[in-house]
Amino acid sequence: MVNIPKTRKTYCPGKNCRKHTVHRVTQYKKGPDSKLAQGKRRYDRKQSGFGGQTKPVFHKKAKVTKKVVLRLECVSCKYKNQLVLKRCKHFELGGEKKTKGAAIQF
């Protein structure tokens, strides 16, 4: 279980800052695919008409987890930066901190 706080003081490479400032942390999420991308247009053109599936459908999935990407937004200048973490199965943003000697609860 990886638990990351919602704010983090780190270096801001923005033009106005260039110093350590507080950043707001969120998890990166992939946006919707563009329907105008060249590959998508080519694929749709090839799929149209008779003939069924024209390109191979990928089945040999190798990875169990994805790498966690953090999106850091500077509080003072709104500069957005991304930070990649290692692979983990359970990721939590702003969860409760563990205390020493406390019983583990699931």
Curated annotation (Swiss-Prot):
InterPro entries the record matches: Ribosomal_eL44, Ribosomal_LSU_eL42, Ribosomal_zn-bd
Name recorded for this polypeptide: Large ribosomal subunit protein eL42
UniProt entry keywords in alphabetical sequence: Cytoplasm, Methylation, Ribonucleoprotein, Ribosomal protein
GO cellular component: cytosol; cytosolic large ribosomal subunit
Top-rank taxon: Eukaryota
GO MF annotation list: structural constituent of ribosome
Gene name, Swiss-Prot/TrEMBL: rpl42
UniProt-annotated stretches for the region Disordered: 25-55
Assembly mode: Component of the large ribosomal subunit (LSU). Mature yeast ribosomes consist of a small (40S) and a large (60S) subunit. The 40S small subunit contains 1 molecule of ribosomal RNA (18S rRNA) and at least 33 different proteins. The large 60S subunit contains 3 rRNA molecules (25S, 5.8S and 5S rRNA) and at least 46 different proteins.
Keyword Metal-binding in annotation: no
PANTHER family, alphabetized: 60S RIBOSOMAL PROTEIN L36A/L44
Protein family (similarity comment): Belongs to the eukaryotic ribosomal protein eL42 family.
Keyword RNA-binding attached: no
One Pfam family matching this protein: Ribosomal_L44
Function: Component of the ribosome, a large ribonucleoprotein complex responsible for the synthesis of proteins in the cell. The small ribosomal subunit (SSU) binds messenger RNAs (mRNAs) and translates the encoded message by selecting cognate aminoacyl-transfer RNA (tRNA) molecules. The large subunit (LSU) contains the ribosomal catalytic site termed the peptidyl transferase center (PTC), which catalyzes the formation of peptide bonds, thereby polymerizing the amino acids delivered by tRNAs into a polypeptide chain.
Compartment(s) of residence: Cytoplasm
Record PTM N6-methyllysine, positions in chain: 55
GO biological process: cytoplasmic translation
Coiled-coil intervals: none
Source organism per UniProt: Schizosaccharomyces pombe (strain 972 / ATCC 24843)
